[in-house]
Amino acid sequence: MRVVHLLVVLATYVSTTSSFNKESIKECAKVLSEHMKETFSKISHETILKQNYEKLVEEEQFDPRAELKKSKHRIEDYLKVRSQFAYKAKISLEARSVRNDSTVNDPQSKSFIRFMSAKQGNDGTTIYESNHLGKRLKVNETKSFNLTQNANFYTLPTSSVSSAVHIPTPLYDRNEDLLRKIDWSDIDAVYRTNREETKDLAFQLFCSEAGYMRYYPAASWFWDNQDEHLDLFDCRNTEWYINSATNSKNVLIMLDMSGSMLGQRYEVAKQTTEAILETLSHNDYFNIMTFSKNTFLLDGCNGTNGLLQATMRNKKALRRKMDTYQSEGKAEYEKALPLAFSVLLDLKGSYALYTKEEMSMMSANATNEYQFHLELPEHVLAATKQYIDSINNGGGDNNRGACENVIMLITDGAPNAYKKIFDMYNADKKVRVFTFLVGDEAIDFNEVREMACNNRGYMVHVANMADVDEKIHHYIRRMSRVVGRHYKESGQLSWWTGVYRERLYLPRPEIFAEPVPITNQSFAVMNKMASRRKIRLQKSEARSRMFVTTVSYPVIVNETFMGVAAVNIPLTEVAQKSHPANIGSKSYFFMLDQNGFVMTHPQLRPIDPFTKYHKQNYNNMDLLELEVGQNQNVRSSQKSQAVSDLVCESGANYAECVDDLRKAVRKMIIDCDNSDVQQLDVLYATELLDRVYPQTNTYYAECINHANFVLGLAVAKGDDYRVVKKQKKYDFGRVKMDWMGDKRWRLHPHWRYCFLNDTDTHMSKEEAFEIYAQQMSDSGKAPLLCEYRRNLVEKLLLDMEATSNLIDSWDTQFNFMKNNLIHLAFFATPSGMIRYYNLTLQDYDYIDPYWSIFEHIGHLLSIEHAQESYNHFITDLNRKSTDDRYYRRAVRMKDTIMFDVSNNSKIWYKSETQLTGYGLNENLTMLGQAFKAIYLDKAVLGVSGFEFAYDHVVDTMAEHGCPASDDRKWCVLLDEHAYVFFSNQNDISYEDYLVGKGKHISQYFGGLNRIAQRAMALLVENKFYTKLTYTDNQAVCKAEKVVTTSGNRLRPFYPIFRFLMQTFNFMVRLASQISGGFLIWLPNIQFTEAYTASFHEGTDVYPCPKQSSFYFSNKDGKNRPGTTHLVNGNRSERPCKMNAKCSVKMEASFVDGTNLVMVWITQDKASENCYDESECSMEISNQVPFGFEEVKNEETCEENEKRKSKANDVCYSIDDDDSENERRPCSTSPTIVSIFQILFGVFLHFCIF
């Protein structure tokens, strides 16, 4: 009972409480500090831990450059093996030939082709007869996938029976040419051999130019919408396919916005633009031009800044701007084409366009500046000599290193082919021109076809929305021909992507058995099943954050490009080759791709915590957007002991120097230049962005050969120490099973220690390691499957040995822990091992005793409605050791016991009459934690901590001058960021806190009320806290929705229309595929919501910087306050403008050795209504604001940073891409649609209207 506990607390402090003045905040804080340090010392056994470690390890100051090189070589070896597997698949495919059987669709023939469908999960199919009857034949399956959880695929269910084949929705899966290519690509034997050689080999892929994708091992398909079986995926739009299939390119999209581009045409044009953008990778650059009577480039600088890198951030930004333009007037090609070439080629000099009437009215010397004149049908183009020379020399230097220049023209027709313009700008045909004629009734084919055919391009007719996806890929096929012809030039050159979220790893919806009748006896089974489901969801959540890079090779057969062979590599595996256990606890590795964008970084937050989608800018973040500046001081060069401030030409503070800083740091890292390392003062943020910690980093970098990545290392000041084993060679024969016999230890769930067999999903990571440990003990050497991670395994064994007697030590403190309501102690190590000790408190239940199963009939197996239980701080909530929030906090506050409160867990009182520490009858208590980093001098050994019932805090504070009471004397404990750890307001509710509606606890102190706001300002003014400003460059903002109204009486029937039109579109596409024709007509009703994959998610948000102030404890600062009084002379403060009677005195004192600050606010005797918001409201002009707000910058035209990709070292020449057989055909021609299709469409059209 809580009364008994309180008596124990009173007895414990009987000698102490009589020896200090409870009216003195300084003495109260001092005694509280001594108590907390004594308690932590007894629980952590810090002295014993250090003694244990000193027998096994020694401290070492490591060389960052040497450690970085070791990690670099490990990563290179790892990536090289994956690259070889992809190359092996390429060679195997190129040695095969495509069959030419004519009976591949005849189930009675031996040549009948089956394949394992990714969407169906078997090899069954439906064949549609290619005749006027349109009959279909159902072919039953002979094989199906038996998907089982795979231990080496992060428990994702896979099948090794065969590879799976995915076919995009617009393609007919029984097209004979498609089937022959699917059969040709069946190299499962190669895939299987590769997989057997390397346990942690991820998905092996092949994407065909025909559109299908084969992947091994098979896994169920991830639908974009599971309920509707919506599938937007096409492997030909992936970065790994685009990189290998085409040269890198500079692309200018010209979008006709003339008056005829209205309604359906414009919607098709927008969809075509999206589809083109979908095919651009980070190695490409682009801009979009709208033209009618005027021309506009959609970037913020109207083209003066040239082309933008094709990041998703830039693509979505320009796509949004398209919606702000309307169709009007005439399409002025004579204005648009010269501007397009000027921007695309970055031409120097100038030109002007005059009408013929304007030219005739000018004087003879009016155009002396322009020495060149070209007469066009409606204008005269006048240009300077510099401009003409620039054209003849191939343009300026703004092509950013891309290989090809491309114009994409989207129009419903052109009045002229403008041969003179193309002859002037593109005489050598170095610029490809692709034309997309949109609209089902478009008839002006000849002019746009001539533009494409005369300029190494291709023309397609995009009749309607159903046409878009497949028609777009004609341009890629056209550009891939040079890859086929010149493939020998690249040799064994591999292509690597940046980071992306692999859809094959994404969690699929779980399917559960039908509910069974609920009985009194079934609730235990129900709870157990709910617990297992919780574990499965945790694992699937981990997979949802699976990001990969992919290595790929083009597959060429007889100089014909056939597709791309690839292997993807989870970045969590790559990161373990540069393991955090090898460096200091505050230091970290990071990796950049060939474009300089961040791939891995502890501050990268790629997933939006609310939508669970990846952010638009997740794979195009610059390093300095994550290394957020701490203050105005920017340091450079460590060659001398005195670190000098960086002085910029533009100024001397951070804001003015940011551009110079970006160039200096980024150039050093991209160039892998460690000769003059850079140092920055930065803010390290926790994952939830509720805490930031200042630290000074020194940066080092190494280039990863072949992949063109950059591996970086940020070493925090004073953090270049680690522990290493005393033995040069670890003796595995000394491994004892007793070290792990108690089962109260856990390993990092995302780190591999030893490889497993695919089928070892029935055992936990800990159980598997015990088996390997037994083999070590028996044989005296490391098992083969542990050799790959030997260094980490040795560190783990050292931690296990050093902490093996902790359980016994914790046993000796059983009574002490019980009396102080401590029910959990733990120690987390850099090797990822956490050892813990559980103690069940007698007066508390760990499963909700007030829950009744009969209240939740119908919710069987639902976590939310299963009987609630205690969420274990380690086994349920914090399994990741060094990656967990508490660990990262502890190592950044050396020699400090950190106190925190958690709303993720609770325990229940056994007695229904027991009251909380605040005197409320709520049946439960929340939990608090204390933790601290343990050091062997300067090197971290781990983080020790314990968890306790929060009632103990309330009772302890009552004995240190702060009993729960009214607001006459308000006592609070603030943590290092001024969040409230304890408040003595007597109406604080645990239940409210646990559902996010609590009062005071865990809230920012300065935002509670006007009194707290003023007190917080004084805490900053008196140097208890330092004000910091953090900019979140990864934030997202909600886009303002444009609301439109319509009086259309048919609007309620739109869902029906949508279904009918989708059904009709499918039938026509199917008939078109079977007949080999092309779709050129559909009724005019189209529902034009974006369905292109990359533009399907997150359309209501956009990337934006957000900024917030933070307040960091100055307990170790140089200007630590010398008095406890927040107002000079301990005078009263009157913070309420509307209430002159409110008068308070404010005091504060650090609780030494902890992260806490004790604050007392005492009302004078005559003081009234200080906490009544109607009489004492918060100040609008807040001196201590807190909370993220969007940084509203005026839109200015700033030059984009020029990024030259390291991936563009090889460019295939297009000079010979001009032969007759290559140029003809250079377009798709419309074919007559069957009478049946037209009649059916007209019938449906008139039925609707």
UniProtKB/Swiss-Prot annotation:
Residues 20-1228 are extracellular. Residues 250-479 form the VWFA domain. GO terms for cellular component: endoplasmic reticulum membrane; plasma membrane; voltage-gated calcium channel complex. It holds the Pfam family VWA_N. GO terms for biological process: egg-laying behavior; locomotion; nematode pharyngeal pumping; positive regulation of locomotion; protein localization to synapse; regulation of calcium ion transport; serotonin receptor signaling pathway. Decendants of the cells AB and AB.p (that give rise to nearly all non-pharyngeal neurons), decendants of P1 (that give rise to body muscle) and cell lineages that give rise to the adult and juvenile motor neurons. Expressed in body wall, vulval muscle and pharyngeal muscle. The chain crosses the membrane at residues 1229-1248. It is found in: Membrane. InterPro entries: Ca_channel_alpha-2/delta (IPR051173), VWA_N (IPR013608), VWF_A (IPR002035), vWFA_dom_sf (IPR036465). Disruption phenotype: Worms exhibit a weak egg-laying constitutive (Egl-c) phenotype and slow irregular pharyngeal pumping. This is Voltage-dependent calcium channel unc-36. The lineage of its organism: Eukaryota, Metazoa, Ecdysozoa, Nematoda, Chromadorea.
